[in-house]
């Protein structure tokens, strides 16, 4: 569903006031947060994807990492997971289903969470994801809003997985580039979140289906600020930009471009289709975090020490120049 259509649908829903619901659907945040006590709040989220790869085990890993990421984006710790499966039992054998679940379990275990059950339904094609419950202190969770003027923006993973998966279906992506993409997607955002928790972050979101620009726009609007992004600093997966140059795209680019139209300014002309990478839909993408400039280099260094080699400082938070909430320079 398009982000614009989804927003209209959610805005039309009746809203129940509950003082313990600290984060609902009104702010397009990554997960809901519900206070249980003065010390504990639940982080609740669900996500489901179609297979970006043929290998069932890897599909399960990607689907699980993608779902668990929303808890990390809220500053939470994942605790329990439920499998959400759509499966064509007449077309695919039980070994495929088993591979998906086993792959997911490796990531659930790595996240130090537990698999508590799930639900499987008959479907025309495989679909997989998790409903995840996490915990966080009710006064210490992160929002996708609240970025402060003067803060620096760090992105923890490369972008470009959407176009690479489509191009791979056409046999256009070199094996090494495709494997690097998969390695990124099965990497949990656990280490990135653990590093960020050591610093004074003001806003965090994970980059998924709306692309870097779409999720950055949500952060900018929610923060009443403008995010200035350095085009040359944004980490891009090998061959992704090349695929756009060859005319490959995704089914989400058009809707993602519509989301940012009227709110984005490019301060330099981009050749060909190179601007498409910023609306490329991600699966299990990285975290985008705003934190003080005085802390950014140390945070980046700790991420690199933790093996997050793709992490980069990609921009700054500026006073709002609405309607230009995003400025690419």
Language-model segment annotations:
Residues 1-329:
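Helix-biased detector of long, well-ordered alpha-helical tracts
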């Amino acid at each position: 569903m398009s982000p614009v259509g989804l927003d209209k649908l959610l805005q039309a829903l009746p809203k129940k006031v509950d003082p313990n619901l600290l984060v609902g659907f009104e702010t397009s945040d990554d997960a809901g947060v519900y206070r249980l006590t003065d010390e504990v709040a639940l982080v609740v989220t669900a996500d489901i994807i179609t297979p970006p790869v043929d290998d069932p085990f890897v599909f399960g890993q990607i689907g699980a990492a993608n779902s668990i990421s929303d808890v990390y984006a809220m500053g939470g710790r994942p605790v329990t997971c439920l499998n959400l499966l759509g499966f064509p039992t007449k077309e695919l054998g039980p070994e495929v289903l088993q591979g998906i679940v086993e792959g997911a379990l490796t990531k659930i275990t790595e996240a130090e969470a537990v698999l508590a059950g799930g639900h499987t339904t008959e479907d025309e094609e495989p679909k997989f994801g998790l409903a995840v419950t996490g915990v966080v202190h009710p006064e210490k969770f992160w929002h996708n809003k609240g970025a402060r003027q003067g803060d620096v923006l760090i992105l923890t993973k490369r972008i470009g997985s959407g176009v690479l998966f489509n191009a791979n279906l056409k046999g256009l992506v070199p094996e090494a580039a495709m494997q690097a993409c998969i390695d990124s997607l099965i990497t949990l955002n656990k280490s990135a979140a653990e590093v960020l928790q050591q610093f004074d972050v003001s806003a965090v979101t994970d980059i998924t289906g709306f692309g870097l620009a779409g999720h950055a726009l949500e952060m900018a609007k929610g923060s009443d600020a403008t995010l200035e992004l350095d085009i040359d600093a944004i980490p891009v997966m090998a061959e992704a930009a090349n695929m756009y140059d060859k005319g490959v795209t995704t089914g989400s680019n058009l809707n993602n471009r519509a989301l940012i139209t009227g709110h984005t300014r490019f301060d330099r002309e981009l050749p060909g289709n190179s601007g498409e990478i910023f609306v490329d839909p991600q699966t299990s993408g990285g975290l985008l975090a705003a934190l003080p400039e005085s802390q950014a280099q140390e945070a980046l260094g700790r991420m690199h020490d933790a093996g997050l080699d793709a992490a980069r400082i990609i921009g700054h938070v500026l006073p709002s120049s609405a309607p230009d909430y995003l400025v690419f320079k």
